[in-house]
Amino acid sequence: MKDGTPCVLRGATEKDAAEVLRCFSLTHAETDFLLTYPEENSFTEADEAKFLKAREESDNEIEICAFVDGKLTGTAGIEAIGGKEKIRHRAELGIAIEREYWGRGIGKALMLACIEFAKKAGYLQLELEVVADNASAVRLYEAVGFREFGRNPRGFRARSGWQELILMRLELDK
């Protein structure tokens, strides 16, 4: 991390299910910038373990965990957009970090690990959507090479009102 504290990144395993669910619930309660509200997650620990096992065994999808002092502090993942030939080159990236650890370099480390994985998996384009008001996330994504390619003014219908989404992509073959 920026302050010199060690941060360990590794692929999630099914044994991480309880901690990943805890982290998911916390991160999704701490901000209105993520896709879901905590209560919308219906995954049980067994469901999460099955999901993580599939990611662990996949050649083209992954969930990466960030640990500080043995505690899971954030996750990021790569998911194929689809299996059809015309879109097989594209993957989507998602990331969530506990608020206590924002601005400490974990996000950048997770992003770089995801980008490296996506390249090795053979993807040519990584995509993400970010709430336009999430300026720190937009700066992070731009810092690692993502560029805006569109906007959706009514992308999220949050409890607080409409949230504009910025559509971003990183071309991995350039």
For the regions a language model picked out, list residue spans one by one.
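Terminal substrate-recognition subdomain of acyl/acetyltransferases
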Residues: 1-3, 162-174
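A short beta-loop-alpha structural element at the N-terminal edge
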Residues: 7-22
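Conserved G/P- and acidic residue-centered "switch" motifs that form tight phosphate/ATP-binding loops
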Residues: 16, 105-107
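Helix-loop element at the rim of GNAT/NAT acetyltransferase active sites that forms part
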Residues: 22-39, 55
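Acetyl-CoA-dependent GNAT
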Residues: 41-100, 111-112, 171-173
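Short glycine/proline-centered loop/turn elements that form peptide/ligand docking sites
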Residues: 107, 111, 134-137, 154-159
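Conserved GNAT acetyl-CoA-binding A-motif
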Residues: 111, 118-129
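Conserved catalytic-core motifs of GNAT/GCN5-like acyltransferases
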Residues: 125-130, 142, 147-163
